[in-house]
Design a protein with these regions (language model features):
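Append "with occasional cross-activation on large, charged helical scaffolds in nucleic-acid assemblies
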Residues: 1-185
Length: 185
């Protein structure tokens, strides 16, 4: 979780100070439910029935970090006295990153280490080719919960409606092009 900076504004609309918005337990609970909903929907559509081909779907995918960026992150956090494992399976690397993020909790260097760690990650993107979501460690993940804010969520809702009504799978190339367009925005 990256801190959200807010501005305090005077009567004339001029910023007079900044502060960090603290996420409340209710916010965290809603976020967890959104993650579960996104995961459930992706898994429900992504897992094909026995003997059937999976239907075309829009996934939110996130690849493993670039090894070179991980090495740079490791060298950076070493200056603060932390060690980061950069070799091994993707699960090993993920555990190492989580261990690092736990170690910096409530330390003066927390924000900078979290930001540099985030920059070492690949960017998540939309695709009809599911590779899972590395950052969340989910095999299936989509964006489903904000159809009024994100067009990919709207695509997911349309596909869900189509499939719930017994419709056939859609043209994968067309949807992959739409995903690529959304990734470029």
């Amino acid at each position: 979780d990256t801190p959200e900076v807010r501005f305090e504004i005077d009567e004339k609309g001029h910023p007079i100070s900044t502060y960090i918005k603290v996420a409340k337990d209710a916010n965290k609970l809603v976020e967890e439910f959104m993650l579960l909903a996104n995961r459930y929907v992706a898994e429900k559509i992504g897992k094909a029935d026995k003997g059937k081909k999976p239907k075309v779907f829009v996934y939110r995918i996130h690849d493993v970090p670039d090894p070179e960026k991980l090495e740079k992150l490791s060298a950076f956090v070493a200056k603060f006295g932390y060690k980061l494992r950069t070799e091994g399976s993707k699960d090993d690397i993920n555990k190492g990153l989580n261990k690092l993020l736990e170690a910096v909790q409530d330390k003066p260097e927390q924000i900078i280490v979290e930001q540099v760690a985030l920059r070492s990650m690949m960017k998540a993107r939309y695709s009809t080719h599911n590779i899972g979501h590395y950052g969340l460690m989910f095999r299936y993940y989509t964006h489903f919960t904000s159809p009024i804010r994100r067009y990919p969520d709207q695509m997911v809702h349309r596909l869900l409606t189509r499939y719930a009504e017994g419709g056939r799978s859609v043209n994968q190339e067309k949807y992959e092009e739409l995903c690529e367009h959304c990734n470029e925005m």
